[in-house]
Amino acid sequence: MSSLIMQVVIPKPAKFFHNNLFSLSSKRHRFSTTTTTRGGRWARCSLQTGNEIQTERRTGGYQPTLWDFSTIQSFDSEYKEEKHLMRAAGMIDQVKMMLQEEVDSIRRLELIDDLRRLGISCHFEREIVEILNSKYYTNNEIDERDLYSTALRFRLLRQYDFSVSQEVFDCFKNAKGTDFKPSLVDDTRGLLQLYEASFLSAQGEETLRLARDFATKFLQKRVLVDKDINLLSSIERALELPTHWRVQMPNARSFIDAYKRRPDMNPTVLELAKLDFNMVQAQFQQELKEASRWWNSTGLVHELPFVRDRIVECYYWTTGVVERRQHGYERIMLTKINALVTTIDDVFDIYGTLEELQLFTTAIQRWDIESMKQLPPYMQICYLALFNFVNEMAYDTLRDKGFDSTPYLRKVWVGLIESYLIEAKWYYKGHKPSLEEYMKNSWISIGGIPILSHLFFRLTDSIEEEAAESMHKYHDIVRASCTILRLADDMGTSLDEVERGDVPKSVQCYMNEKNASEEEAREHVRSLIDQTWKMMNKEMMTSSFSKYFVEVSANLARMAQWIYQHESDGFGMQHSLVNKMLRDLLFHRYE
């Protein structure tokens, strides 16, 4: 490794220049807000770069952050103390014994499913894989004619990457094989498991498509008549967002609430889930504090008052994407990426003139300090923050993995900025792209590729150049993850962005192209998300990338659907429901 370091030159983070940017306070932008005929809000500011030039600019109208620096730094939790770790260890041993000693095959599978939903399955991975491995090779313990057990077994095996054929459901279909048997409609628990299992389908699996349609139709009817409160709650939850599309930790609290109401609740499992939740929350708070210190030190939110100050929301995203406890470094890194993507996105979408955006793109393509000097002051600090961050991450990867990631990281950030410029040109020309033209660019402009690129280099144990090349030719798993991220984002933010005068999003592109209603367009986008998940599911079963990189790629898509599940902007506009979910995970301990 030492010889490799001698041969690779990574630009030194340009901290020597960073301090000079804070002397630009005399050039801070002066805002006065006016409305325009194009919709949205505009700000009039002066850029003092010699001669004073009046430039009309948009503003996003975003609200200030709900958590200032001092508030974030004040968070503390007793659950980071050693005594809680020791207590949890004792309960983990007890649950391991339950898994080993449970003789009922279905009860074992149900316990595994509960552990996953409670967010504590990470403590039992070896035991779970051993149990599922035995279930994969022996079917004798499960009645293949029982829909509930068959569907539960199928779903868990696929979730753990076992190759299970959809043919296990053939015995539940009618004689012609065209639909499922009508006699199943009274098996509500079985239908719920069938519905959940259907979301692990890959492209071309017709039986699972039939299963989804059949189960959905009858579960929607059961919601209106079923009197079992716990079962009804599970059905409503699944119809809102199926288990396979849900992130684990952000959902854990609500499942703990549901689990403790069940008559078959295990007190030890419940107590472990509550304690573990509070311990993880304590860890998350420490990571958030570190990310917040970095954000404060960049000065971006002070020098660029038009950008979204959302460091807490940026961190919240990471808790669903990088779920394993030991990857705190990666969560903090991802928080920084989210903050930088958000900042640069606001520069392109809201504030920069087309000429400035072209200058910024050229500077990013050249990737050197000299290019930065041609930028207006507000862009210089943005450029330098990104430049320093990427070089620092490349250095850490070289130090820890012995691999120079610099050219790959530069490529993905340049690609992101170039996609932003394409959309800026559409805006200034008043261009309305077709849905195909829009998606060709927007799955890149959503910002998922830099996230996955950085995570690839951190989460791959032994990095091979061939794998790095495959990843950065935008492998199908990257494309699927970013496509779902884009479409889910569009479903939640498109109306707000169109009101600001932005280019049409996927919903509006479809409406313009097909002369469709908004609801028809949204239904089409939902179908695109479903189709893309089938591509994702196939990649999850067959991908040559590391198991955990595949997992975080899927989690990026899941977190997008979690944030935007009610088709409103839970990030930029601080939607009250998302705000509550964020507080419950990061700040409110479980009593």
UniProtKB/Swiss-Prot annotation:
InterPro entries: Isoprenoid_synthase_dom_sf, Terpene_cyclase-like_1_C, Terpene_cyclase_plant_C1, Terpene_synth_N, Terpene_synth_N_sf, Terpene_synthase-like, Terpene_synthase_metal-bd, Terpenoid_cyclase/PrenylTrfase. Residues 1-44 form a transit peptide. Mg(2+) 1 binds at residues 345, 349. Mg(2+) 2 binds at residues 345, 349. Its main location: plastid. Binds 3 Mg(2+) or Mn(2+) ions per subunit. Pathway: Secondary metabolite biosynthesis; terpenoid biosynthesis. Mg(2+) 3 binds at residues 489, 493, 497. GO terms for cellular component: chloroplast. A motif (DDXXD motif) lies at residues 345-349. Changing residue 338 to I: Lost ability to produce 1,8-cineole, beta-pinene and alpha-terpineol, but increased ability to produce sabinene and acquired ability to produce limonene from (2E)-geranyl diphosphate. PANTHER family: OS04G0344100 PROTEIN-RELATED, TERPENE SYNTHASE 10. Belongs to the terpene synthase family. Tpsb subfamily. Monoterpene synthase (TPS) involved in the biosynthesis of monoterpene natural products, components of the chemical defense arsenal. Catalyzes the conversion of (2E)-geranyl diphosphate (GPP) into 1,8-cineole, and, as minor products, alpha-terpineol, beta-pinene, alpha-pinene, sabinene and myrcene. This is Cineole synthase 1, chloroplastic. It comes from Salvia fruticosa (Greek sage). The lineage of its organism: Eukaryota, Viridiplantae, Streptophyta, Embryophyta, Tracheophyta. The gene is CinS1.
